[in-house]
Amino acid sequence: MIGVCVFNVETILNVYNAMQNKGPVTAKYITIAGEVKNPITLKAPLGITYAELIEMAGGTTVSDYALIAGGPMTGRICQPFDTVTKTSNAVLVLPRNHNMITRRTVKVTIDMKRAMAACCQCQMCTDLCPRHLL
């Protein structure tokens, strides 16, 4: 056992506000990034749609787009009219033909065949490495 607790800043802020104001969490800080005119992080009320958040970021810069809720590595594909929940943290707007979108929409049988190989030469690790090590 390590004996360490890890909290993100928003969680600590929510605990503080709950203790001081005795109120529930009614908003989340959300980052809207990718193919939008003005990538932003803003405080959004729970229940607002991703489409409304995209409009707050100036709209998309591509006509045919897909959304990923969460980060590029562990996020999931979502729809524009899905809503912000207490676990939301980011929305990535990407062209529908982007590698991160096509990778998440591939059939399970194809993905299983790729998993049998050590490397499928997709370059995903190289593209997403934050330190450009690969």
Each model region followed by its residue ranges:
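Iron-sulfur cluster-binding cysteine motifs and their immediate structural context
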Residues: 124-134
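Hydrophobic alpha-helical positions that pack around
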Residues: 1-48, 56-63, 71
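Ferredoxin-like iron-sulfur electron-transfer modules
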Residues: 101-123
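Active-site lining segments that contact anionic ligands and/or coordinate catalytic metals
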Residues: 27-29, 39, 64, 88, ...
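Short acidic, glycine/serine/threonine-rich loops at helix termini
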Residues: 42-44, 56, 78-82, 103-104
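Donor-nucleotide binding loops and adjacent catalytic segments primarily
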Residues: 53
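Non-heme iron-sulfur electron-transfer modules
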Residues: 84-101, 133-134
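Short acidic beta-strand-loop surface patches of small beta-rich interaction domains
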Residues: 65-84
